[in-house]
C-alpha cells in the first residue's frame, strides 16, 4: 500500500475548479481528472467505503497529487484533455487515435486540382470532410474523376506538361495544362464538383440539363451528348449512394460496452451524405463505469484539433450519461460554437442510430470471441513451456534483405489481446557485410536491449526467427543486458521444418539449446506461428520500401550533377524511374532544370552509353 497523507493534503486544498494529477511510487502519472470543486472531488477518493474496485486500486497506488487551478470548468476540460494526451495515464479511459483525419481538397489554383489531404490545412482552397479513412477519400476521388474532368496532379507535374497525359485520353481530365479546355468551361466543372461534394446532387443535374438543352438548341450536338452522359453517370451514382433526408451535418454514435471492451461506432454524415463509418476502441481500465467511458470519449474525440474544424450540427448518441449537459456546455464554450448531444431521436435519425448500435454490438461480440481465443492460446503456451507464470508480452525478431541489399530487422510485439502495433519497431541495419544475418541480428538485439529497464516493456518471451547461430548471438546479448532483471526474457528460436514446409517448425530454447516440438493443431503452436508470420510480414514490407527507395535514389543520384532536386523533377515529370530510363534525350530536356548536356549525361548513364 502506497503511503499518502490524504488528511493533510485535503486540509489546505482549494474548492476552485481545476485539474488534478495522481502519481504512483515511480513518479508516473496514473490518473488525470478535472473538477468543478477540487476539494469536494478529491475528498471522494478517500472515503471510508469506496464502492468501485477500479477506484480502490487507483487510490492504493497514489503517493502524490498535483493540482492546477483554472478559471472555469471549460479551462479545466481543455487542460485535462492536454494532460491525458501527454501522460497517457493507466487508469484513464484513453482514445488512442492520434492520426489526423483525411480530407478531400479542392485547391485555390487558377485551374484547381482535387487531391487527398491529411494534416494541417495551410494551403488555400476548400476542404471537404473529414472522411473516416483514407480509403473513403480515394474512393471519392476515383468517383469524381469519372464525373468531373478535373485534374488531380500536383502543381509541379501540371506546370511541366507539354502534352496531355493519360488521364486526358481516358476522359478523366480536361487537360487545362495544355489549354485543351477553356478557363470558363473548367471553372464550370469545378463549381459542379463543389456542389456535388456539398450534397447538392439535384442542383448539379438541373444545371447540366439546362446546359445540355442550350447546347442542343445551338446545334452543338457533341457537347450536348457529353452533358447527357454526365447526367446519366450522376443519376447512377445518386441511386447507389445512401443519402439522408436531412441535409445537415451530424455524427451518429452507437456505443456498446462489455467486459472492459468499449466500441464507439460512428456514422459521419455531412451535407446529407454518409461519408462512411469508423469504429473506435478506447483503452478502458477494468471496472470503469459507463458514464466515465462515455464522457471521456466525447471530450477527447471532439477536442481533437482535427475534428474541431468540421464539428457537425448535432451528435446523436445511443445512450446518455450523468454529466452530458455540463460536457455539452464546456465543449461548446471551448470551441466557440453550438454543440448538442441528442440521445432521444425518431424517424430517420433513429434508423441511423440503430445501425450504428448494431455495428458497435457486433464489433464487441467479435472482439470478445477473439480475446477468449487469444487468452486460451496464451494459456496453452504457458502450459507447454511450463513457465510457472503468465505471459504478458512477447516479441519476435526477423531479418529481411535481397542478396544482402537493404537489410531490415523487425521486432513485433504481442500481448494477451494480440498484436500491439504501437510497439512495433524496424531497425535499418548498416555497417555490416551484405547477407550477414548473424551481424544483422546482433545489431538489432543490441539496439532493442541497450537500455532495457523495468517499465513494463520487458518481454516475457523473445522469439528469434532464424537458425541456431542467430539464437546464440541473441542469447549472449540478452544475458549481458538483462543480468540485472529478476526475470530476464526467455529466448526461443523458430526454425523451418524439413523441406521448409509450414507446420513442421522446430523450436529451440535459448541457453540450453534444447529442441522441442508442439502439435501442429495446438493453440500454442498457432500463436507462435502467428507472431513469427507477423514479424516476417513487417520485416519484408520495410525491406521492400527501403530497397525501392535506395534503388530510385542511387541509380539517379549516382549520376554526376543529379541531386535530390533534379531527381524529384525527373521522377515527377516522367512518372517514375522506368520512364526516366526509357526517355530519349529530347524528352529529358523537357524536364525543368535539365539542360541538353545534362540530359545526354543522364541518358548515357542509365543506358550504359
Curated annotation (Swiss-Prot):
Residue ranges occupied by any GIY-YIG domain in the UniProt entry: 15-93
Pfam annotation, one family: UvrC_RNaseH_dom
Ranges of residues in domain UVR: 202-237
Domain of life of the organism encoding this protein: Bacteria
GO biological process, one term: nucleotide-excision repair
Coiled coil: none
GO cellular-component term (any): cytoplasm
InterPro entries the UniProt entry points to: GIY-YIG_endonuc (IPR000305), GIY-YIG_endonuc_sf (IPR035901), GIY-YIG_UvrC_Cho (IPR047296), Hlx-hairpin-Hlx_DNA-bd_motif (IPR003583), RuvA_2-like (IPR010994), UVR_dom (IPR001943), UVR_dom_sf (IPR036876), UvrABC_protein_C (IPR050066)
Keywords of the record: Cytoplasm, DNA damage, DNA excision, DNA repair, Excision nuclease, SOS response
SMART domains: GIYc (SM00465), HhH1 (SM00278)
Subcellular location: Cytoplasm
GO molecular function terms listed in the Swiss-Prot or TrEMBL record: DNA binding; excinuclease ABC activity
Family: Belongs to the UvrC family.
Assembly mode: Interacts with UvrB in an incision complex.
NCBIfam families on file: PRK00558.1-5 (NF001824), uvrC (TIGR00194)
Purpose of the protein: The UvrABC repair system catalyzes the recognition and processing of DNA lesions. UvrC both incises the 5' and 3' sides of the lesion. The N-terminal half is responsible for the 3' incision and the C-terminal half is responsible for the 5' incision.
PANTHER family: UVRABC SYSTEM PROTEIN C (PTHR30562:SF1), UVRC/OXIDOREDUCTASE (PTHR30562)
Protein name (record): UvrABC system protein C
Source organism (scientific name): Shewanella denitrificans (strain OS217 / ATCC BAA-1090 / DSM 15013)
Amino acid at each position: 500500500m502506497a503511503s499518502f497523507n490524504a488528511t493533510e493534503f485535503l486540509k489546505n486544498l482549494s474548492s476552485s475548479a481545476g485539474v488534478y494529477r495522481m502519481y504512483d511510487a515511480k513518479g508516473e502519472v496514473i490518473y488525470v481528472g478535472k473538477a468543478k470543486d477540487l476539494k469536494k472531488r478529491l475528498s471522494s477518493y478517500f472515503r471510508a467505503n469506496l464502492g468501485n474496485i477500479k477506484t480502490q486500486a487507483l487510490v492504493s497506488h497514489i503517493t502524490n497529487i498535483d493540482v492546477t487551478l483554472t478559471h472555469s470548468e471549460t479551462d479545466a476540460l481543455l487542460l485535462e484533455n492536454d494532460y491525458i494526451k501527454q501522460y497517457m495515464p493507466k487508469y484513464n479511459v484513453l482514445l488512442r487515435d492520434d492520426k489526423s483525419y483525411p480530407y478531400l481538397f479542392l485547391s485555390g489554383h487558377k485551374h484547381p486540382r482535387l487531391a487527398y489531404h491529411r494534416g494541417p490545412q495551410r494551403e488555400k482552397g476548400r476542404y471537404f470532410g473529414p472522411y473516416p479513412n483514407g480509403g473513403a477519400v480515394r474512393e471519392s476521388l476515383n468517383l469524381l474523376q469519372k464525373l468531373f474532368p478535373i485534374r488531380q496532379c500536383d502543381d509541379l507535374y501540371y506546370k511541366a506538361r507539354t502534352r496531355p497525359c493519360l488521364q486526358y485520353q481516358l476522359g478523366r481530365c480536361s487537360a487545362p495544362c495544355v489549354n485543351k479546355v477553356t478557363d470558363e468551361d473548367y471553372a464550370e466543372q469545378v463549381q459542379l464538383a463543389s456542389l456535388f461534394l456539398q450534397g447538392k446532387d439535384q442542383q448539379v443535374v438541373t444545371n447540366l440539363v439546362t446546359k445540355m438543352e442550350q447546347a442542343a438548341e445551338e446545334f452543338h450536338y457533341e457537347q450536348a451528348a457529353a452533358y447527357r452522359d454526365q447526367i446519366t453517370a450522376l443519376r447512377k451514382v445518386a441511386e447507389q449512394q445512401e443519402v439522408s433526408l436531412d441535409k445537415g451535418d451530424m455524427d451518429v454514435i452507437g456505443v456498446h460496452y462489455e467486459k472492459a471492451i468499449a466500441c464507439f461506432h460512428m456514422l459521419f454524415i455531412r451535407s446529407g451524405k454518409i461519408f462512411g463509418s469508423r469504429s473506435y476502441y478506447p483503452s478502458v481500465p477494468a471496472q470503469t463505469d459507463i458514464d466515465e467511458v462515455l464522457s471521456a470519449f466525447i471530450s477527447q474525440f471532439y477536442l481533437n484539433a482535427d475534428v474541431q474544424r468540421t464539428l457537425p450540427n448535432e451528435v446523436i448518441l445511443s445512450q446518455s450519461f450523468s454529466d452530458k449537459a455540463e460536457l455539452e456546455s464546456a465543449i461548446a464554450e471551448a470551441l466557440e460554437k453550438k454543440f448538442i448531444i441528442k440521445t432521444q431521436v425518431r424517424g430517420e435519425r433513429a434508423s441511423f442510430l440503430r445501425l450504428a448500435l448494431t455495428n458497435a454490438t457486433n464489433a464487441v461480440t467479435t472482439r470478445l470471441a477473439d480475446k477468449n481465443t487469444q487468452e486460451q492460446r496464451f494459456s496453452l503456451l504457458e502450459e507447454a513451456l511450463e513457465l510457472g507464470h503468465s505471459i504478458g508480452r512477447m516479441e519476435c525478431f526477423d531479418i529481411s534483405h535481397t542478396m544482402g541489399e537493404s537489410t531490415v530487422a523487425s521486432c513485433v510485439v504481442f500481448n494477451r489481446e494480440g498484436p500491439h502495433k504501437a510497439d512495433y519497431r524496424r531497425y535499418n541495419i548498416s555497417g555490416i557485410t551484405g547477407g550477414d544475418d548473424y551481424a544483422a541480428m546482433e545489431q538489432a538485439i543490441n539496439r532493442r536491449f541497450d537500455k532495457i529497464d523495468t517499465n513494463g516493456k520487458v518481454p516475457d518471451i523473445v522469439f528469434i526467427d532464424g537458425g541456431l547461430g542467430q539464437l546464440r548471438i541473441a542469447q549472449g546479448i540478452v544475458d549481458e543486458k538483462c543480468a540485472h532483471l529478476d526475470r530476464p526474457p526467455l529466448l526461443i528460436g523458430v526454425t523451418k521444418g524439413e523441406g521448409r514446409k509450414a507446420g513442421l517448425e522446430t523450436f529451440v530454447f535459448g541457453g540450453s539449446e534444447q529442441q522441442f516440438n508442439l502439435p501442429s493443431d495446438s493453440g500454442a503452436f498457432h500463436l507462435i506461428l502467428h507472431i513469427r508470420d507477423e514479424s516476417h510480414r513487417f520485416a519484408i514490407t520495410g525491406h521492400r520500401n527501403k530497397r525501392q527507395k535506395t534503388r530510385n535514389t542511387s541509380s539517379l543520384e549516382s549520376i554526376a550533377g543529379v541531386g535530390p532536386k533534379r531527381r524529384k523533377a525527373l521522377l515527377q515529370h516522367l512518372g517514375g524511374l522506368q520512364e526516366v530510363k526509357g526517355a530519349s534525350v529530347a524528352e529529358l530536356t523537357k524536364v525543368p532544370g535539365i539542360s541538353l548536356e545534362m540530359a545526354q549525361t543522364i541518358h548515357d548513364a542509365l543506358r550504359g552509353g
